[in-house]
């Protein structure tokens, strides 16, 4: 057993969460992230082709519980847009992925904040401070010497997702 850092991307199942939790309890330097779409969609409510696939309601609940308990360190987009022509191909020939960059905050707020499952400050931490810390970047917080990246938003503003308005397609 080596003390090598490991970051698990796009964790999406209860089993993966359990394995990560066990590794952390043993002191392994493991971090992980989940995607907003794996916190909101379930395989019985949508038929999106993403990798890893959209999972069961039980898996979604396990991810949410793991975020709340601190097992999950970050919430990060799996931004993988494809053209309409690519996505219209038969399932076995279509690339997996979905636009995530422009919807990640809204989906996360819908799944966690507006359902009362997580405070806004914790969501912001998991989407900014923690990812920057994991990657060793001078970002994610307003501090002397850090990049002054800032987003101002109204967590209660409602809007309709319109793919025609996306900057990334």
Residue ranges: model-predicted function:
Residues 1-75:
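Histidine/acidic residue-rich metal-binding segments in metalloenzymes
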Residues 16-17, 40, 83-85, 160-161:
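Glycine/Thr-rich phosphate-binding loops of Rossmann-like dinucleotide-binding domains
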Residues 12, 35, 80-82, 158:
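Catalytic metal-binding/acid-base residues of hydrolase active sites
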Residues 44, 53-55, 59, 96, ...:
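Short capping/connector residues at structural and topological boundaries
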Residues 57, 132-135, 169:
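Short gly/ser/thr-rich secondary-structure transition/capping motifs
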Residues 1-3, 48, 68-69, 73-75, ...:
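His/Asp/Glu-enriched, well-ordered alpha-helical/loop segment
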Residues 48, 91-92, 160-169:
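Short, surface-exposed loop/helix-turn segments at secondary-structure junctions
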Residues 20-21, 87-89, 164-165:
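Short amphipathic alpha-helical segments
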């Amino acid at each position: 057993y080596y003390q090598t850092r490991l970051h698990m991307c796009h964790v999406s199942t209860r089993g993966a969460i359990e394995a990560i939790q066990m590794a952390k309890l043993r002191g392994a330097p493991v971090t992980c992230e989940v995607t907003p779409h794996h916190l909101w969609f379930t395989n019985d409510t949508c038929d999106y082709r993403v990798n890893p696939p959209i999972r069961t309601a039980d898996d979604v609940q396990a991810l949410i519980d793991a975020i709340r308990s601190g097992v999950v360190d970050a919430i990060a987009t799996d931004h993988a847009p494809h053209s309409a022509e690519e996505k219209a191909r038969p399932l076995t020939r279509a690339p997996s992925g979905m636009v995530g960059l422009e919807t990640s905050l809204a989906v996360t707020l819908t799944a966690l904040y507006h359902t009362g499952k997580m405070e806004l400050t914790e969501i912001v931490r998991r989407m900014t401070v923690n990812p920057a810390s994991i990657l060793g970047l001078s970002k994610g917080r307003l501090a002397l010497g850090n990049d002054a990246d800032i987003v101002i938003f109204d967590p209660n503003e409602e809007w309709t997702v319109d793919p025609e308005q996306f900057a990334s397609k």
